[in-house]
């Protein structure tokens, strides 16, 4: 809910069905994959601080007992490339699209996780990185897109994204999900 955390951001800048998609994915992990609910760190409308703390918690868990364990990270929200470097960033609800580099750098997240003991790491990102959102741009850059660079994958790491670099992710209004 970007509009609740930032001035001059209207509700159209929110990511439709992001929370619903995350809840469905959490239930998928629990019911179909058998992951205990206490092993799922579920954040709604996460701020930069909350996302950073969750990443640090995950790193500590990986250091304690990650060697043979699979790690799954699911993110549904805005993504944007930094204009100069074109590096993709995850944009927490309290980060404005004009300050992309204050978000979570996808490259840094992948590097941090790949350096810890782990089995497989799956990053599932339901966000576009074209600079355009699912409804409208977070920064009001209508018609302007930036093609992000692809981050390097770590060893035994999988990255799934809802769209490629120059595509916008869309929503399925009828089924109330992001695509």
Question: What residue spans do the PLM features occupy?
Answer:
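Surface-exposed loop/turn and secondary-structure junction residues enriched for glycine/proline
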Residues: 5, 18, 38, 93-94, ...
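Catalytic-loop motifs flanking and including active-site residues across diverse enzymes
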Residues: 21, 105, 179
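Caspase-like (clan CD) cysteine peptidase catalytic core
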Residues: 52-76, 80-138
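Active-site-proximal C-terminal subdomain of hydrolase catalytic domains
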Residues: 25, 29, 44, 121-179
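Boundary/activation segment at the start of structured domains
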Residues: 1-88, 157, 164, 171-176
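Intrinsically disordered, low-complexity segments enriched in small/polar and acidic residues
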Residues: 6-10, 101, 139
